[in-house]
From Swiss-Prot:
Organism: Escherichia coli (strain K12)
Gene that specifies this protein: yeiL
Note: Its activity might be modulated by a sensory iron-sulfur cluster, by reversible dithiol-disulfide formation, or by both mechanisms. It is not an oxygen-responsive regulator.
Annotated segments matching region Dimer interface: 111-131
Location in the cell: Cytoplasm
Protein name (database record): Regulatory protein YeiL
Any one GO MF annotation of this record: 4 iron, 4 sulfur cluster binding
Lineage: Bacteria, Pseudomonadati, Pseudomonadota, Gammaproteobacteria, Enterobacterales
Cofactor(s) it depends on: [4Fe-4S] cluster
Length: 219
């Protein structure tokens, strides 16, 4: 806890009730449709947010990277339908019991202020992502997406979900993936695609982010 900024998010000392959780890659930090019992603070690792749509399709919504809260919307709104949060890689989270701390945290001005800043940053990042989807070619967006979602240099997202997230056709996605293989950026394997040239992929991704504001998400 001393190595993170977690304790600085609250006016009250929450050390006694803070727990440490460890999640392996592909473990679920939050199960869809189940109210989380804990307010998580991701201190290390990356995770993805999923939602099941009315037609039964599973849609990839967003990515999280440490440090950030997970479950803060459910803390504020008890009626909010929880979405699935899955670890992309090994994740470590500090956590507070949601039920016990909800009344206290909803009256903690420091926590609420930090939460407002966090949510505004998420909203800004989503706006930037939408703008990038409209303004940059798929080679740049797919490079960033691969770096966001890769697990130990292995990219294995479902093509249907990736195409939907990037707002392109399935065929267009496969065409650019084949181009990356031809250019030596990726190697096709049985489990997915191995990243062969991270530097070149990062260069393509950072063309959309010259100020490196989101480069921490792509470690």
């Amino acid at each position: 806890m001393s190595e993170s900024a977690f304790k600085d998010c609250f006016l009250t000392d929450v050390s006694a009730d803070t727990r440490l959780f460890h999640f392996l890659a592909r473990d679920y930090i939050v199960q869809e449709g189940q109210q989380p019992s804990w307010l998580f603070y991701l201190t290390r690792g990356r995770a993805r947010l999923y939602a099941t749509l009315a037609n039964g399709r599973v849609s990839l919504i967003d990515f999280f990277a440490a440090p950030c809260f997970i479950g803060e919307i459910e803390l504020i709104d008890k009626d909010h339908e929880p979405r699935a949060v899955q670890a992309i890689e090994e994740c470590w989270c500090l956590a507070l019991p949601m039920k016990h701390y909800r009344p206290l945290l909803l009256n903690d001005t420091l926590f609420l202020r930090k939460l407002c800043v966090t949510l505004s940053h998420k909203n800004y990042r989503n706006i930037v992502s939408l703008t990038q989807n409209q303004s940059f070619p798929l080679v740049n967006r797919l490079a960033a997406f691969i770096l966001l979602s890769q697990e130990g240099d292995l990219y294995h997202e479902k093509h249907t979900q990736a195409a939907e997230y990037l707002g392109v056709s399935y065929r267009h996605l496969l065409y650019v993936l084949a181009q990356f293989i031809h250019d030596g950026l990726l190697i096709k394997s049985k489990k997915g695609y191995l990243i062969k040239n991270r530097k070149q992929l990062s260069g393509l991704a950072l063309e959309m982010d010259p100020e490196n504001k989101f480069s921490g998400m792509m470690q």
